[in-house]
Amino acid sequence: MRIGVYVCHCGLNIAGVIDVSALEEMAGELEDVVLAREVQFLCSDSGQEGIIKDIKDNKIDRVVIAACSPRLHEKTFRHVMEKADLNPYLMEMVNIREQCSWVHADDPQMATQKAFDLIRMGVAKARFLRELSATSSKASRNVLIIGGGVAGIEAALNLAEAGFPVTMVERESTIGGKMALMNEVFPTNDCSICVLAPKMTEVQNHPNITLYTYSEVTDISGSVGKFHVRVTRKPRFVLEDKCKGCVDLCSEVCPVEIENPMNYGIGKSRAIYMPIPQSVPQVVLIDPDHCVGCGLCQLACPAEAVDYEQKPEEIEFEAGAVIVSTGYQLFDASRKKEYGFGKYPDVITNMQLERMLNSAGPTGGRVLVPSTGQPPESVAFIQCVGSRDKTVGNEHCSRVCCMAALKNSQMVKERYPGTDITIHYIDIRAAGEMYEEYYARTQGMGVDFIRGKVAEVYAGEDGRPVVRYENTLESRVEEEAHDLVVLSTGYEPSKAAEGIGRMLNLARRPDRFFASAHPKMRPVDAPVSGVFLAGCASGPKEIQVSIAQGSACASKVMQLLGTGELEADPMGAHVDPDKCIGCRTCVEVCKFGKISIVDKKAVVDEVSCYGCGDCSAACPVGAIQMRNFENEQILAQVRAATAHKSQCPFVVAFLCNWCSYACADLTGMSRIHYPTNIRVIRTMCSARINPEFVLEALKGGADGVLVAGCRMDECHYIHGNFDAKKRMDVLKEIIKEIGLDPKRLRTLWISAAEGERFSNTITEFVKELEEIGPIGSELKREYTATGLEEVAK
């Protein structure tokens, strides 16, 4: 083995504190190191060229780069390895800038010692580095889109135009979602169906789109590139290829009246009906729960499209990626009994008002008081019904309700100028483009706004609904009767979402909508590879945001499936079948469902493995390992650190790449100092930290161990830090049982932005360890190493 060590000056960023020449000399004396060199700027063109020349001239087969953070330049130096015809994963970076020179400028001597310790740890790991290469596999270019609302439509058209085959599955009998039911849309007051209908028709007619309406996804298995999908098409009892959409002929003869689900209880339809006039496809359906089987519609249909014997149809296909655009459902206003919905006919929801305002809706665009059939002279809107409300379990804001109420109040005012309109609100949230102007315009039209919660709605002596409310701006409780009360109901995840979430193993937010991989950096990526979230599937949002997310999802899919092949990250998990005992521990630990048991052995889906390492930490026999973060590699770092204990107390820290290690980097960038007593080992996730690593550090002489990961509920692998915390909590009890002070193991759950807190934690931990004393000092008998060794076994 021939290892080359390179130490970067980084101008004075490193060399201004650390004795770089001494590092070069000490590194050159390490076992297996055949070349050690200090360079002004390793990342410069000349620096990179020098490394390439050295590798070729000296037949170097491993490289250690002591410079800045691997989060900054790891890819840079991997490319250098490739140019030198060396496998890029035979290089290890050592962070002596952000986590050494920048945080220990007040103690150059110990900073130099710490830097050498880190280099020694890097060389120890380098001895166990293996050649890694990305593997590729064929991927289906077909894309499954679940949900045919505006977000799904936008994604489908973007993909289809780019040449990708798309299969759209919509559980309702028409695509278009809630937008297709609305009258006009804010803030421009465009006719909703006028702008949406052309896109709906384009979806139906596009040669690259296969559309299944009145259908549900019943099973999804497999993983990115090769999802196996099963869809059930429910019977319409009308043949799609024969129906001409001439609904009047069949509907007129039907003797049964029903409530059209698209009208939310306003008006009536027949048992054979068209969902909305602009339905896509233009095909009627029969409601089997109310149809009496009289046969009149079948006799009236000139196309012979009615088929009472139609059965559910099962369809199976492959998809390379999935876009979840399942939308939302409206809060059931009857759950707020104090508002009288379902009890008083003149208390309706905002969506019912939308259907009244729609010229193609059940009332032909007229707003009518249900009890009288006449236009209202006074209307009250009550905001936040079923949102921002702990009593119904919905503490979140539904984001759109304020603007929807403003829009509908404008519509009522325009059609019935003499109508008095009052909006009862907690806060008006008008934060989008042109929203504040829209709010001002509504006020200018004479709409009254009263800040405060509504206590109840009850029937007055004349039968009209009376609103009892607080006026917080005037500190009064008042009552007022209205002809019509409109409840602005909140948004909840759609009925389909729960099943889809189970099939795809999607995480949920506290508001029960699907959680993205990261709310800021990866807002449309699901935590599962090959799955993307668009529109209200990931929470309430406006139409324009849903459209933007549909386009974003399409772009992500194009990047993923553009070549028809998928490249697996070589640093995922892999199983040694000779060691595996088929215990299923890894299967249960992997929340992403990427491990299965085949022939009594664990098998990892390496193409879609996330690389968190949770499975590896849980494996009782060490059969499953994380490439580049294998047990022997990390243990080599631990032993190299503790074998030359350069100060007391001595702390070994395991930091996750995404938050705690990034936080340590930020601490350095902010020049926030902390004691030199800490030696950091990076893992991708805190879940990778095997209790064996901690015990090995303590057995080797470390006075304390710090395990740090992302804040709870913010782990980049969703569940990783929860599993890490459980393991460390148990380990603290074990440490206590063998006679050591459990305070020697400290955990920290921190964001990447909390540099001051990171520094304070290190400082406090070192002081605490000074009070406890050197490792084993609290024991009456000398059995520390023996006890730890037994526990490790």
UniProtKB/Swiss-Prot annotation:
SUPFAM superfamilies from the UniProt entry: 4Fe-4S ferredoxins, FAD/NAD(P)-binding domain
Sequence positions that bind [4Fe-4S] cluster 2: C254, C291, C294, C297
Cofactor note: Binds 4 [4Fe-4S] cluster.
Keywords on record: 4Fe-4S, Cytoplasm, FAD, Flavoprotein, Iron, Iron-sulfur, Metal-binding, Methanogenesis, Oxidoreductase, Repeat
UniProt KW Protease keyword: no
One of the record's GO molecular function terms: oxidoreductase activity
Cofactor annotation: [4Fe-4S] cluster; FAD
InterPro entries given in the database record: 4Fe4S_Fe-S-bd, 4Fe4S_Fe_S_CS, FAD/NAD-bd_sf, FAD/NAD-binding_dom, HdrA-like, MvhD/FlpD
Reactions it catalyzes: coenzyme B + coenzyme M + 2 oxidized [2Fe-2S]-[ferredoxin] = coenzyme M-coenzyme B heterodisulfide + 2 reduced [2Fe-2S]-[ferredoxin] + 2 H(+)
Any one of the GO BP annotations: methanogenesis
Pfam families: Fer4 (PF00037), Fer4_9 (PF13187), FlpD (PF02662), Pyr_redox_2 (PF07992)
Localization (cell): Cytoplasm
Enzyme class: oxidoreductase
EC number in record: 1.8.7.3
Sites where the protein binds FAD: 147-170
GO cellular component, one term: cytoplasm
Binding site for [4Fe-4S] cluster 1: C243, C246, C250, C301
Binding residue positions for [4Fe-4S] cluster 4: C590, C609, C612, C615
Annotated function: Part of a complex that catalyzes the reversible reduction of CoM-S-S-CoB to the thiol-coenzymes H-S-CoM (coenzyme M) and H-S-CoB (coenzyme B).
Family, per entry: Belongs to the HdrA family.
Protein name, as recorded: Ferredoxin:CoB-CoM heterodisulfide reductase subunit A
Organism: Methanosarcina mazei (strain ATCC BAA-159 / DSM 3647 / Goe1 / Go1 / JCM 11833 / OCM 88)
Gene from which this protein is expressed: hdrA
